[in-house]
Amino acid sequence: MMDNDDALLNNGGPQSGAETVYGTEDNNMVMSEKNDQVVSIVQQLAGSIYQEFERMINRYDEDVVKNLMPLLVNVLECLDASYRINQEQDVELELLREDNEQLVTQYEREKSARKQSEQKLLEAEDLAEQENKELATRLESVESIVRMLELKHKNSLEHASRLEERETDLKKEYNKLHERYTELFKNHVDYMERTKMLMGSTHSQMSTASDRMEVSRARLNPVARSSGPVSYGFASLENSVMLDTETICSVGSQSDDSGPPSLQNELDMSLPSTAERGAATDSLQQQHQATSPQSPPDTSPVVPNVPPANVGRSTTKKEQRSDNNLYQELSFQDNEESEENEIVTGCWVHPGEYASSANDNYFGMGKEVENLIMENNELLATKNALNIVKDDLIVKVDELTGEVEIVREELSAMQQSRTKLRQRISELEEELKKTKEQVKQQNTEQEENDVPLAQRKRFTRVEMAMVLMERNQYKERLMELQEAVRLTEILRASRTVDNLDKKSKQSIWKYFSNLFTPSNRPTERIADGLGGGPMFRNTGGGSPAHSHGSPSRGSGDNRLTLAGSQPPMHPASAGLANALVMPKDYSEDGGSERISARRREQYRQLRAHVQKEDGRLHAYGWSLPINKANQEANPSRHSGGVPVPVYCNPLAEASPHMKVFCAAGVNLHGGFTKDGQSLIPADSPYAPKSTLKITEITSPTAEQSVEALDRQIARASLETLEPETQLSSFVWICTSTHAASTVSVVDANQSATVLDAFPICSSHLLCIASVQGAMESDYALLEQSEVVKAGEMLQRPGEGTELLGKVEFVRVKPKSEDEQNSNSKPQQQQQDEEEAKEATEKSNEPLPPVNAEEPLVNVEAIKIRQALPGAPQRLSSGNSGSDGNQANNNNSSSTGSVLFATKSLNPILGTKEREDPPMTSVGPTMWMGAQDGWLYVHSGVGRWHECLHRVLLPDAVLAIVHVEARVVVALANAQLAVFRRQTDGQWDLNSYHLVTLGDRNHSIRCLCVAGERIWAAHRNKIFIVDPISLNIVHSLDAHPRKESQVRQMAATGAGVWVSIRLDSTLRLYNTHTFEHKQDVDIEPYVSKMLGTGKLGFSFVRITALMVSCNRLWIGTSNGVIISVPLAEVQQKTSSDPHGQMPLCCMANAQLSFHGHRDAVKFFVSVPMLQQPNLNGGLTFVNKRPDMLVMCGGEGYIDFRINDNDMENSIQLEPNQTIENRGDKSYLIVWHVSQR
């Protein structure tokens, strides 16, 4: 030992750089360090530790630090490494800071560059805008030019048409002149013939006359031809006229030279020539139209037998129109004729001169004709001049019209520009006014800062009117809120308790917890306070045994249960007549001693009022009228008239802040595929048997008479079943906290056992509905629907400003995460489940140890199972590894599910959870609507936690109903969403129809199915809608005020009961005639039964409504439950072909002493468990099955017992107080026998 000490002292410390040996032969460790590699701080620390160890070795021994030194060395090494890492990180941090500075500099540079680019962009936009304006201006000018050209084109067309009309008029005038000239020529010829016959005196005179006749004959042919319509105005005939004249003259001269002239020859030649001239004159128009071919140039010049006139006529085929007027043509013709006659005969004599030389008496008419022709020519010339002037004027008018149009367009453009400039000026003036007002306001504010408030400027009239109007609106809202707050405060005051400190009270309850045993409880006092009600006893929570007598002790969880005077029950419900628990539900802090004393006095008055007989009898927790009590005096003989309470307990003991919102029974009917196969196995007790198949019931196949009769009986029994009797005994209850919403599945026959519980979403679930599986009739209805006939795109415009009746088709675009919904849950649902897990971890109660790999959501399930009576605890610390692996497999197969440890078999399919086949929406489904607009569809058969479909709707979902193979969803924006099945039987949530029923600012509060129609409540109106055609069949006003909204509706038979918000009156309407049948006010009844005044029972508001078991079930806002039997006389004597009218009378009403401390949330009616037949299926007999009516609400209260008695009758859990029991949601179940 001394040698080791000397060696240690000689070696010095770790700063010497030498090696130091510690320990014995079995445990030695060498530590060598280099000063340049070790951090200085670690070196100093190691030196100080070395000195301490040296003192310890000197004082004690080497063995003291033998085992500690290696550990310390490791610590120092780790510290050194951490220091080095820290230094490296400091260096990296400096580098990162430099990089950050560079990035900031670059960011600033990029920011400035972006500003410059934005500035350039703005400049480019300005340039583009200016170019657009210039182009627009050019476009306007081009358009004006185009319009001007179009106008000119139009004017030119009009001018051309006028020219054509002028040409037509000239042709008509020419024809008239030609006829006139022909008549004059005929008169002249006749005159000449008479003259020649009178002349016979001398031969010289006759020769002279014959010469003149020849000359006149030579002139007649060209004159007749030139004066006719064929040669007039055509330049091509001028040469032909000259040639014909020469030919005729030559022929005539030859004939004259061939023989001696005589009077007889001249007369013989003149007569046929005259006749030919007349015929030629009459047939000029016909010869003009003829198309005889011309003779070739090398033929014989003239045929002697052909008259000379025909030769001239044959040359008028290709004549062209000349541009000469009538005067020019006539003058040209006269000149031509004179030249021809001079050439042929050598001299030309005017007819006037001939007439004067021969005989002035006979030839005076020709001069008059010539005068007339001259006058006519002058008139024609004047007319032509006037026409020319007129044409010039028309052209000038057209030019002026075009200029006027151009000026008009320019004027309109100037007016538009002036209007734009005025608008711009007005805008600038408004901006200037606003700027001036702002400047004035700023100046005024600056001035008013130094002015007291009393001396400042007052409001104007407009501002005062606006302020008053806003004040009135706010005042109306304030009054409504004050009324709601007053009712809430009254109800809250009715639930206040004595002034007790929470901490002291909790400690006292813990300290004296052993004193509250069943033997020390004042059960006798409770039994005495029940009046004519049933006795109570203490039994085990899971024991189905009954004891009829004094209270006895149970072996399990102690609960207050019905005993003694309980009626005989159905054998299947033997396990239900146990454990009617009536715990107290207090959650508010106590007030002063004066308030607690007043509270006790109020409950004493209420208890005294309730215990009054007043002609009523108390039985089974109900207050019965005297006439009903006489009928129910012998319970054994007639026990089916009064509902018997069989269960009352919180839904989830471990979740005090979880509130129930809604619930629905599961309808397991249907589930047939298109080929007729059922999704539910045949060995399941809920499987549809052959006697109940619709296809076999309605099939027209040949059967034996007995089998056919059995099927008809089965069909009739199936049709006469009430809707609630077709449900199963499973109930889905939706509960919500501030963070998540959860669904709990319970069996009403064993309400204390929660089969499954799983989260749905983070929002509140507002409604739930059960939808039966696909029936074979649904496929035929789907194929024959109007929506399919319209190509799935049925749309219809709305009416009015609210678009009432508008139908629009919505198709949801598929998303990638929705496509993977069948394999894994969506991200939103996983987030919702995580929030639900966080919400379930808030309880501080002890839990049994569970597997570390199991999800935290199961902790909530275990908490609930611990609190439920009679629930076996199968998950404990003693689970084997195989069980843990099995639980892990279950959780992995169903991601995010919440499964109870007690759930081993599916009660419907009879299989284990992990062995359940994949579910589809062809089978029975449960539809849930959330406040955020999501609609969730889960299977009602198996794998309850898995979401089959979901869709986001435009607004919150408030109600869901199923009718005629359609699911109709009411939204908060006054729309109905209608879903239908696909051709394979699954529900199609990717496409649906929206039907608008009113203003989008108000919601559709509730839906109801009456027959084959849907009753939808929107504000104070009720719309009856056909779910197939989506037409609004009828609408009615349930209340005269629009502000009074319809809140609940319940249909049965031929009537629909309707309740109004903030109203205690129920209204009954006929489903077929839509007539108002009856009004029932429940407020006087509640006030009579429970008293009025300070407890707030006079303010009755209906919050839940249901018709079941031939009863009208009513739940109020203060927790009172009323059951009103329907009129039996109406049921027996009704002759309505459409159904029975559900009339009722409040004189027969029954009030339950078991109620809730807050509003009643829901009623659910499901049948009790049916006895299976030999084949394993359910049998339906003629008698109606017994029903279980479940009611849910917040807290529990018995109106017959005061607070102190109820506190003494409560058994608390180990770490539980009365305060946290007041926040729980309670379920109350009644058994109603219909036999």
From Swiss-Prot:
GO MF entries: JUN kinase binding; kinesin binding; MAP-kinase scaffold activity; signaling receptor complex adaptor activity
Skewed-composition ranges (Polar residues): 282-293, 874-897
UniProt biased composition (Pro residues): 294-307
Domain of life, source organism: Eukaryota
Repressor recorded as keyword: no
Sequence segments annotated as region (Disordered): 1-22, 278-325, 520-572, 813-852, 869-897
Gene Ontology BP annotations: axo-dendritic transport; regulation of JNK cascade; vesicle-mediated transport
Annotated SUPFAM superfamilies: WD40 repeat-like
Record key words, sorted: Coiled coil, Cytoplasm
Biased composition (Gly residues): 529-543
Coiled-coil ranges from the UniProt annotation: 84-184, 366-493
Subunit relationships: Forms homo- and heterooligomeric complexes. Binds the TPR motif-containing C-terminal of kinesin light chain, Klc. Pre-assembled syd scaffolding complexes are then transported as a cargo of kinesin, to the required subcellular location.
Name of the featured protein: JNK-interacting protein 3
Protein species of origin: Drosophila pseudoobscura pseudoobscura (Fruit fly)
